[in-house]
Amino acid sequence: MSIEEIPQGADVNVIPKNEKKARELIKKLNLKQIKGISRVTFKQRGNLIYAIDSPDVYRSAAGTYVVFGEAKVDDMNQRIAEAQAQQAQQEALQKAAADAGKTEDKSPEAITADLEKASLGDKKAEDEEEDEGEIDETGLDPKDIEIVVEQTQVSRAKAVKALRNHDGDMVNAIMDLS
């Protein structure tokens, strides 16, 4: 039978010439074939695995095994990386679906709460504007004020206020503003 005579998609096992010779020699050694084994794996250092699906396994009287089949290299590090990437992608999809599922609440209570939050934000802005007026820096070292402003990225007035609240202690003033 030639290759042209085999129908497309047929399940045919083609045994190489060397493997055929090895099988004939195995039969002469009186090895017993073991049935029911669906997969054989050989593990090597570095999480490298050689896997043989649907192998032909023979056992000698001494307890050694001879395995025939097509070996496929299976890199566990690559598998783990792929699994982690797939898991991260699934989590991102779930998060996106959860975010898309959230709809804004347009009940009167929610609108009132939003307005109150906005008005509190306006009060904070007014406080900041009041701080920008005349600043009384008496009793404070100008270098301390500059250090607090640099470290916390706040206005000079807020830095002076924090230093006054902490009796000129720069560390506590910076921690308070951070």
UniProtKB/Swiss-Prot annotation:
Gene3D superfamilies listed in its UniProt record: DNA helicase RuvA subunit, C-terminal domain, Nascent polypeptide-associated complex domain
Compositional bias of kind Basic and acidic residues: 101-126
Protein name: Nascent polypeptide-associated complex subunit alpha
Domain NAC-A/B: 16-80
Similarity-based family: Belongs to the NAC-alpha family.
Chief subcellular location: cytoplasm
Biased composition (Acidic residues): 127-139
Known function: Component of the nascent polypeptide-associated complex (NAC), a dynamic component of the ribosomal exit tunnel, protecting the emerging polypeptides from interaction with other cytoplasmic proteins to ensure appropriate nascent protein targeting. The NAC complex also promotes mitochondrial protein import by enhancing productive ribosome interactions with the outer mitochondrial membrane and blocks the inappropriate interaction of ribosomes translating non-secretory nascent polypeptides with translocation sites in the membrane of the endoplasmic reticulum.
GO cellular component: cell surface; cytoplasm; nascent polypeptide-associated complex; nucleus
Alphabetical keyword list: Cytoplasm, Nucleus, Protein transport, Transport
UniProt-listed CDD domains: NAC_NACA, UBA_NAC_euk
Tagged with keyword Ubl conjugation: no
Annotated stretches, region: Disordered: 82-145
Keyword Iron-sulfur: no
BP GO annotations: cotranslational protein targeting to membrane; protein targeting to membrane; protein transport
Pfam families according to UniProt: NAC, UBA_HYPK
Compartment annotation: Cytoplasm; Nucleus
